[in-house]
Amino acid sequence: MECQRCPASARNPATVESRKEKFCDECFIKFVSTKQRKQMMKDEYFRNLFKVIYPFEKEGSVSKILLPLSHSDSGSLVMLDIVHDLLLEQTKQHNNRTGFTVDVLTVFTEENVSVIKERMESLINEKMSQLNKISNIFNVHFIDVNEFFNNASEVSTFIIDNENFEIFSKSKSVDDSNILTLKEILGKYCLNNSSRSDLISIIKTQLIKHFAYENGYNAIMWGHSMTKLSEVIISLVVKGKGSQIATFLDSESFDTLNNKPCKYKNLYPMKDLLSVEIESFLQIRNLAQFLINVEETNVKPNCLIARKSLPSLGQQKLVKNMTINEITNKYFQDIQNDYSNIISTVLRTADKLTQPKSSMAKPSQCQICQSKIYTNPSNWLNRITVTSPYPVETTEEKYLFKQWQDSKLGQSHTHYVELLNEIKQGASNSLDVEDGDVKLCYGCLILLNTSIKDKNLVWPKVDTMDITANATNKNKELSQILDQFEINSDGEE
């Protein structure tokens, strides 16, 4: 079996088969790299970001790019590897000059910080140090996921009135004695794995975007493959957040954060590549060593011809125990080798979507996920839902109702009613107009109503996150907090 892209006179043995075409290692690496670079040059804005601009002394001639790197995600690592090769080419062609610099940002949790730093140190020594000897092209940052809570001076308790789906909130100041943590939020409020997964994803995305906003980057490069983007699209629809799809995929407009315009655009350079192609690239370039889940990565589906038959990592999860993200991931992983056209169709269709027309009197953003709100979900749910219970009448019904009141579920409902009345009272007595005008998107409202304990959640107020130059000592600027986690080009902490 020979490579179909090599010259006819010197064909190498094929090692990869993808999209009904056979590749050798060298041709496949070129195929993947070309797909990514094509997306990086998709329009004039991004072409000016990534190419070398003369004269070098001109202001803005070197762009700042933020690359969020997850050490459990192959896509972002492969993207970084291809970007590294592009920068290396630019230094050779332009007398040690490059068109852009890359800041790698990793969000970590307490459980994996040590292994992440170990993997990053290896990555720096093998990939980044060579370029940084020429110039300060790569910078590496770490941020604790708990900084999402530590940087807010106020938090809000959101609660849903289950009679009319109206949302109430109560704000309070944060000090050293009542700082929240991710572990506390997930353990105290989330009833299932789907809600935990959703909140973690929201927190990480917001941290990355806040970091980009504060430090003046020109673009954020996300490592989502075509498969991953399709998973996210279907997940958003299932979660009631379909209106976010157009904004999520938008690479033409500058992003917004808390209704403020940002100076960066979002880019998905891997959107023309299937995840099996990314996994194959990872294996060929021996990049799995930089991930924290090496064993799991090695058994992921790929399109290598000499694929090793590796044992499963254990019994697969039952569907009922999977999160929405895991279910969509499993579906697309199962079909992408034989029916990749389904994945591309999902993405092409989503790319054609535009933002819905808003029926709101004024622009509004969800207080949890920060997505735009186009219609009031509380009013719509109240119109289509019957929430009034049938009255208790017979002796048997009264007996069963008493049993329910004494159960854990009944006690939880009693606690919910008490908390709702307390927050309602606080909201009615508050002089803060914003507290009486709290809005959540439909997806977060449903999340709060069905997957959060007692239908209430404590969440930082994004507009009080002091991560700007005017930050106080208690709420340090985000970049200052990151200083203690910096790794320089020599791999030293």
From Swiss-Prot:
Changing residue 71 to L: In strain: SK1, V1-09, YJM1129, YJM269, YJM270, YJM320, YJM326, YJM230, YJM339 and YJM627. It comes from the Eukaryota. Changing residue 428 to G: In strain: YJM627. Changing residue 436 to S: In strain: YJM230 and YJM320. The modification Phosphoserine is found at residue 489. Keywords: Cytoplasm, Phosphoprotein, tRNA processing. Changing residue 409 to S: In strain: YJM627. Pathway: tRNA modification; 5-methoxycarbonylmethyl-2-thiouridine-tRNA biosynthesis. GO terms for cellular component: cytoplasm; cytosol. It holds the Pfam family CTU2. It is found in: Cytoplasm. GO terms for molecular function: nucleotidyltransferase activity; sulfurtransferase activity; tRNA binding. GO terms for biological process: invasive growth in response to glucose limitation; protein urmylation; pseudohyphal growth; tRNA thio-modification; tRNA wobble position uridine thiolation; tRNA wobble uridine modification. Interacts with NCS6 and URM1. May act by forming a heterodimer with NCS6. HAMAP family: CTU2 (MF_03054). Present with 2860 molecules/cell in log phase SD medium. Plays a central role in 2-thiolation of mcm(5)S(2)U at tRNA wobble positions of tRNA(Lys), tRNA(Glu) and tRNA(Gln). May act by forming a heterodimer with NCS6 that ligates sulfur from thiocarboxylated URM1 onto the uridine of tRNAs at wobble position. Prior mcm(5) tRNA modification by the elongator complex is required for 2-thiolation. May also be involved in protein urmylation and in invasive and pseudohyphal growth. Inhibits replication of Brome mosaic virus. Belongs to the CTU2/NCS2 family. This is Cytoplasmic tRNA 2-thiolation protein 2. It comes from Saccharomyces cerevisiae (strain ATCC 204508 / S288c) (Baker's yeast). The lineage of its organism: Eukaryota, Fungi, Dikarya, Ascomycota, Saccharomycotina.
